[in-house]
Amino acid sequence: MNHDSYSDSYIRGILNTVKTIAMVGVSPKENRPSYFVFKYLLERGYRVIPVNPGQAGKEILGQKVYAKLAEIPEPIDMVDIFRNSAHVPPIVDEALTLQPKPQVIWMQLTVRNEDAARHAEAAGLKVVMNRCPKIEYGRLSSEISWIGVNSRTLSSKRAQTLGTGVQRMRLGPASADDGN
């Protein structure tokens, strides 16, 4: 897969499918990007589980923090990595030992590791690198276009709210190739 660009349907398919996200490297500090993304995804209805060895046993926004992925007592759909690119391979290796395996490895902005991506894809996982799910969610739902940001999703209508569930905003049109 070309990890320099992703189709909207690929990203939309992931964000519409995953429900439980393990966020590796989330910070309890309110001024950190990982905290913003963690809070945003929680507010959109995702189950987000913080993973940070230095904060293990504590809580971030009411969610128990785990030291490592293997300690999480429930299935994970996506692993969102907020760590330096050099730290990605052991995180992917650990994710691949989970049963069931997660569906997606997502590496945040500036995080890329081609070897880890190939390893995850060889095991059947989808991979996204150098992207932020908060930004992608806002762009695809047209949510950020209402605050003056060009989301590349043109609409004269306010983003649709879905009420309760996995997400609060509809992520654009459904298509037959979502998830490809």
Language-model segments: what does each one mean?
Residues K29-N31, K39-E59:
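NAD(P)-binding Rossmann-fold cofactor-contacting core
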Residues H3-S7, K58-E74, D80-P90:
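Glycine-rich, highly charged phosphate/nucleotide-binding loops
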Residues E59-L61, I76-D77, E114-R118, E136-E143:
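Short, charged, surface-exposed secondary-structure boundary motifs
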Residues A95-A123:
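ADP-ribose/adenylate-binding Rossmann-like module
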Residues M1-T17:
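Short N-terminal or domain-adjacent regulatory/targeting segments
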